[in-house]
Amino acid sequence: MVPQTETKTGAGFKAGVKDYRLTYYTPDYVVSETDILAAFRMTPQPGVPPEECDAAVAAESSTGTWTTVWTDGLTSLDKYKGRCYDLEPVPGEENQYIAYVAYPIDLFEEGSVTNLFTSIVGNVFGFKALRALRLEDLRISPAYVKTFVGPPHGIQVERDKLNKYGRGLLGCTIKPKLGLSAKNYGRAVYECLRGGLDFTKDDENVNSQPFMRWRDRFLFVAEAIYKSQAETGEIKGHYLNATAGTAEGMLQRAQCAKELGVPIIMHDYLTGGFTANTSLAHYCRDHGLLLHIHRAMHAVIDRQRNHGIHFRVLAKTLRMSGGDHLHSGTVVGKLEGEREVTLGFVDLMRDNFVEKDRSRGIYFTQDWCSMPGVMPVASGGIHVWHMPALVEIFGDDACLQFGGGTLGHPWGNAPGAVANRVALEACTQARNEGRDLAREGGNVIRSACKWSPELAAACEVWKEIKFEFDTIDKL
């Protein structure tokens, strides 16, 4: 065995463990208009200085590694490195900090959410010096926004396609979510659409199981759509889930939906992946299909307050990847969602320009450069008594989705749909007349019950149903 010998290094290179602060902590840095900015909630391990920790985050999510390498001399680190340019303690929290990191735009492939996330949240979340790390927000620079196509159509084009204006849209997830045959599934869709809903929906885990293969479902649902349209004179849709085990299978299902002439399909964007989602969004844009996006698996990523990725980031990146609808929580239903936080990322989904507002969790001003907006979908444990709050919270540009709140009606699916449609139109009219739905919403619903027995029956069934749990993720 040859004994190891000490090697003397040249004057321009010295190996060893890096002190990240020397290179990546730059509090004097002036942010460029083209930089991608990130706000991380950071919890260092005991004894690790926060400046070293946030510099490590900037390094490991950009050009850095744990030691000096001789190839650093073959490029310009000053041009390509991420920089921690600000650090602030989190009020009321021990050993927690918000670290602000700026990334040069040239670090990222144009039009690729996949590459953006691979860099910014790829390895750094497993860094040993960190006890916990959460990506709270991203500022996507206008120069980078313009490399994305975004939603296939957007809110205004969707309204034009559907010829529906002046109110929110109504939907319903077909239940039970698994186990129905394709024919019975189509029957449930027809009854809901005939009763007055605009949309029905595949549940996120309905793909192509032995009890209901995807092609059979598509055919029976298309029949239900056309039959209900003929009877009501309204344009109807069903979110046909195109999510599949392969990208080829996904596009095959999208093509089948196009050939059947249905207006909208669906994708589970987190389980399906951003690359698949962007490809599907491009297909929908080219072939005139609306794209409904479900966020299945999001709570695995975003629910913990100290670690993961906040949903406002997932919502922003979905707008970039492409989708016309996105589930956003309800504030009042069974799923997690604080009011101000939810309204913050709803604005980031819909509006063209959103100012920084820390009271709503928005860390950066975001300019979308006229990229089409995404319609928020309120779904999960809502019923007719929630309608005044939903109209007051979300306004008109939202899809309000009642699954059990439609199919659980004691008289059946169609009366359940009637009850929701009557409640929505009553609340919309009351709001337009200047009434305060936050205070008078209950009276609006009770008044509408006098001329809608379907609504009266629904109100009686769900009069005591509440989901009163404290929100985990608070500002």
From Swiss-Prot:
According to UniProt, the name of this protein is Ribulose bisphosphate carboxylase large chain
**Family the entry assigns:** Belongs to the RuBisCO large chain family. Type I subfamily.
Residues with PTM N-acetylproline: 3
Sorted keywords for this record are:
Acetylation, Calvin cycle, Carbon dioxide fixation, Chloroplast, Lyase, Magnesium, Metal-binding, Methylation, Monooxygenase, Oxidoreductase, Photorespiration, Photosynthesis, Plastid
Cofactors named for this entry: Mg(2+)
Q: Which residues carry this modification: N6,N6,N6-trimethyllysine?
A: 14
User: What else is noted?
Assistant: The basic functional RuBisCO is composed of a large chain homodimer in a 'head-to-tail' conformation. In form I RuBisCO this homodimer is arranged in a barrel-like tetramer with the small subunits forming a tetrameric 'cap' on each end of the 'barrel'.
Check the record and name the Gene3D superfamilies matching this protein. Ribulose bisphosphate carboxylase, large subunit, C-terminal domain, RuBisCO large subunit, N-terminal domain
Reaction catalysed by this chain?
Answer: 2 (2R)-3-phosphoglycerate + 2 H(+) = D-ribulose 1,5-bisphosphate + CO2 + H2O; D-ribulose 1,5-bisphosphate + O2 = 2-phosphoglycolate + (2R)-3-phosphoglycerate + 2 H(+)
Per its UniProt entry, which superkingdom is the organism in?
Answer: Eukaryota
* Organism name: Dunaliella tertiolecta
Question: Whom does it interact with, and what assembly results?
Answer: Heterohexadecamer of 8 large chains and 8 small chains.
